[in-house]
Amino acid sequence: MDKYTAYVWPRLEPFLVGVLPATPPSKFSMHYLRKMASYVRTRDGCFPRLGWQMWRHIACGKLQLAEDLAWLYFETFDLLMPRSAEQRLEWAEALSQCHTQKELDRQRCKLSVDTLQFLLFLYLQQLNRISLRTSLIGEEWPSPRSRSPSSSSSERDAKISSQNKNWDVQAHLTFIQTHLPELLELLVEPGQLSSSGQVLRDSHLTSEAVESLSLLLEGSVSHSRTVHPVHKLLSRSQLQSQAGFSKLSCSYSLQQFQDFLRQALCLNPFGISNCSQSGKKLSWALQVEGTLKKAKIFRNTHAAPPGSRLVLMSQVCKQTLAKDSEKLNDVNIKLHRCSEAFIYLLSPLWSVTLDKCRNSTLVLGPVRTSVHIQSCENVRVVCVAGRLTIGGSFNCTIHSLTPTRPLLLPGNASLTLGPFHTQYPTLEDHMASAGLAVVPNLWNQPLLFGVEGSAPDTGCYRIQPPSEFYPLVIPFQMDGDNCEIPCSLPEDFQKALESREKTIEEWQKTVKDAHLNKAQRRQFQALVEQKFHEWLLETGQRQELDSLLPPTITPSSSAEHWSSNQNTLKEQTHEQPTGTVC
């Protein structure tokens, strides 16, 4: 029987993409979800699929959520669904045709979700629930720090934003093990509950209920590397008997099924810790002298199933790293403690997390699900993404193209939101493969996720003024046809660019009409170059320019080298991580 020993673990994707890295609403407790589970089974239009109209009624009328928040969770759950790129592009096209709120509501009402899986998804939000008791462990009592009652809750919420458990596979396993009875209770039919709402001892789970658990659980059998959703894993008759399956009723004994899962549950073998310990190491980054820790880049893409493919980039410092490798296609990327770096990942990606990065620029290919920025400082991010989430970050600038409202969590300060402003030759092809369109684009309509019961901090962000807007040029030669930013710029930004271009043309004409002699031209050229070098140093652009060059080129000649011979960058070998797209 050892041949059929099952190993079941929590899937990474619902925790990584589905769980919002913030304290959930108090109405997502088991008390209210138990009521919702009974309610949806007795109302038309709620079971087995729950439409937006009924969820809005439940969320706003029963759970007292704001409509924007209700749609946020509904939309986030939809990001987890395995829809094709064509389906997502069709949905984006339909939304872009909505010109009034009534038309938008009508379109949203066409969206529905699996009811049981959505219940599990809502319960899963408890992963990042703050415990007042645990948040105070380790502090002296009385605390030497004065903390006003009004700020304490927001500080704790900002802390959970920066220390969320979305990547922590041990936390995922502990959560499932601890809350397994309640998770299964949400799947039990109302007729198997007592008058007080408690699960009866001889309760059963339908095959459909077990199938819904595949949102959270997957696994394999011993001596096999093939990973299956949990309901397909149980298609083996030997495992069915262990899990309490009855052929007569075509259902599982709840108690026996729970015992089976408790024995089978184990740590996800494709988590971030295993990736860094036993994954393949990539020599993409330079080891820069003067840095305390070595840059580390690992991947598990050679062995992990879809949704669990990871690339970890840690301590990438003081360099430019540019890649459009197939190793990045549809992977989850985590950038940890990168500083003073310029990173270009120009491939279609699955999700991206920036954690504790500072003084860096990150340019991404289209991200199918979410980009999450947490505990970062002075970081510039340029991305096309299904969702953008920012928490606990300071002085960051984000240029985005996104069909959903950017989600601003507690703890942010001095954020700047600007329109997407770059291109590379294969960008539009990558967007199509990721199911991301140019419209709708809600980059300038952020949703502030505040502490429950208090007003969100509307002063934590600003929309970039057109006078500060400059397009970003990706400094690499790549094959492809596209040479334009895929989305049109807002009118005021476009006018600002045209005005600036006109000023440059007028300045060039003034220089031409001055009729300088040869000595005057040399003097004028020297002055312009001097001012240019001063500007490079003042703005920090000199560091980026230097990092584009091979180590054999001295930084002192970087500006001249770049302006006189751009093709040199393309001639570097694929082993050279700086200044070339490999």
Curated annotation (Swiss-Prot):
One of its GO terms (cellular component) is cytoplasm. It comes from the Eukaryota. Residues 559-582 have a biased composition (Polar residues). Residues 140-159, 547-582 are annotated as: Disordered. PROSITE patterns: C_CAP_COFACTOR_C. Residues 305-451 form the C-CAP/cofactor C-like domain. Keywords: Cytoplasm, Cytoskeleton. Residues 140-153, 547-558 have a biased composition (Low complexity). GO terms for biological process: maintenance of centrosome location; maintenance of Golgi location. May play a role in the regulation of centrosome and Golgi apparatus positioning. Belongs to the TBCC family. This is TBCC domain-containing protein 1.
